[in-house]
Amino acid sequence: EIRIDIEQAASSGPTASITSIEQVHNVMNGFVKGMNIKLKFDVSGMQGRTVRATAWFYYADNSTKLNNAYGNQVSVSRSDTAPYENTTFTMTLFMPYQGLNMAYGWSGSLTFDIAIYDSSGNKLARQDNNSFTFSNF
C-alpha cells in the first residue's frame, strides 16, 4: 500500500460572492420606467481594480437569450473600483422596461442572471434564474 498526499495552495486570484439580489419594479428613473436590481456582493483580492456587475436577460426558460433591436443580448451593467482588498458592494442596476425590447401587448415571465467580473472580463461569481413577470401594455 502506498500513500500519496497532495496539497494544493489556495487560489491567490480574485474571488467574489453574491450575497443578495432584490428586484424593485415599476420605478421611475427620470422619465423612464423600469426595474431596479439591488445587489450586494463581496469581492476579495480586488483592491484598486475595477469590478463589474452585469444582469443578462432571458425568456422564462433561462436559456433563450432576450435580444435587443441590434441582435445582442439584453443586459445592464455597472462598474466600480474596490477600495479595499476585501470589499462589500451595494449596487443598483436600472433596467428600463423599453430596453427589454418586448412587443406591445406581450405578457409573460422573464429571467435574468447576475454575473460579477474583474477588469479583465473574468467571471468571479454568477447567480442564475432570477425570474419576474412582465407585461408590455
What do the predicted segments below correspond to?
Residues E1-A10, Q73-R78, S119-F137:
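Short beta-strand elements
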Residues R3-I37, T133-F137:
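Short, compositionally biased P/S/T/A/G/V-rich stretches that sit at domain boundaries
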Residues V27-F41, G48-R52, T90-T92:
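Contiguous beta-strand segments within globular domains
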Residues K40-S44, Y58, P96:
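Solvent-exposed residues in well-ordered beta-strands and their adjoining turns
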Residues V43-V51, S63-L66, Y104:
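A short beta-turn/strand-edge loop motif at beta-sheet boundaries
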Residues R52-Y58, A115:
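Beta-strand signatures of extracellular beta-sandwich domains
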Residues Y58-Y70:
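Short aromatic-acidic-glycine turn motif
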Residues N72-S120:
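Short, solvent-exposed, Trp/other aromatic-anchored flexible loops in extracytoplasmic proteins
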